[in-house]
């Protein structure tokens, strides 16, 4: 069965870049959310195998969404995306249960390595 991945970022171009990278490498069950609140709602609806989520977003940021998701499912696989210079936020995310973090702008092979490590192959 295909692995479901939820891509969460308020920037449409970042979601598209992630989607393109993953779809070119065999991941087909890709879903999108535009902010943390949308991510929590879609997590409940889709039960994805992995969530890749930005930290800085409107309405509900990635850290709040991470805590909400992990509160619902303690085994949820969540990877945070962050720009350079947000190291303290990244450490907060890891302490809150994030499996890994990817620095933006990301390199496609770094995204794939992280996804493959957590989920196995496509």
What is each stretch, according to the model?
Residues 16-24, 91:
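Charged docking surfaces used in two-component/phosphorelay signaling
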Residues 57:
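Receiver (REC) domain active-site loop signature in two-component systems and cognate sites
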Residues 88, 106-115:
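C-terminal output helix
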Residues 27-34, 42:
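Short hydrophobic/Thr-rich beta-strand motif most characteristic of the beta2 strand and flanking loop
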